[in-house]
Amino acid sequence: MALEHAKSFKDLRVYKKAREVSQTVFRVSKTFPKEEMYSLTDQARRAARSVGAQIAEAWGKRRYEKHFVSKLTDADAEQMETQHWVGEALDCGYLSPADAAQLNSGLEEIGRMLNSMIEKADSFCGSPDYVLREDVLEYFTNAPTDD
C-alpha cells in the first residue's frame, strides 16, 4: 500500500481513528446513568474529543517540531485519560467488557500511531506545503506633488 502525503490533519489515519473512537465513546456514554452526566460522562466525552483536537492543533504547529511534538504528546495523554474513564465505566458496570475492549483497542492503536509520529516528527515538520502571504499593495498618500 502506497502512502500519500497528508494535505490536512483530516487526511491523517490517526485523526480519523480518534474521531471514530470519540463517536463510540459518545454513543456508549448515552446509556450511562443521569447522575454521571456531569462527572464520568462529561469527563470521558471531553477526553475522547480532545484527542482529535490535539492532533489538529499539532498539525497547525508542525512548522516548529517542538510544538508539534508537544501537541502530539498532549493527544497521547488525552487518549490515556480516555482509557482511564473507560476503565471507570467498566468498573461501575456502565460498559460491557466487549465495548471496553473495543474502545481500549482503538485507544491503544491511536497511542501507537501518535508515538510513531513523535519518533518521526522531522518528516512532518519544517516548511509547510503552503505559504500564506498578502499581495503587494501600493500605498499612496494625499501629499502634494512638486508639479
Sequence positions of predicted segments:
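Amphipathic alpha-helical assembly/interaction segments
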Residues: 1-147
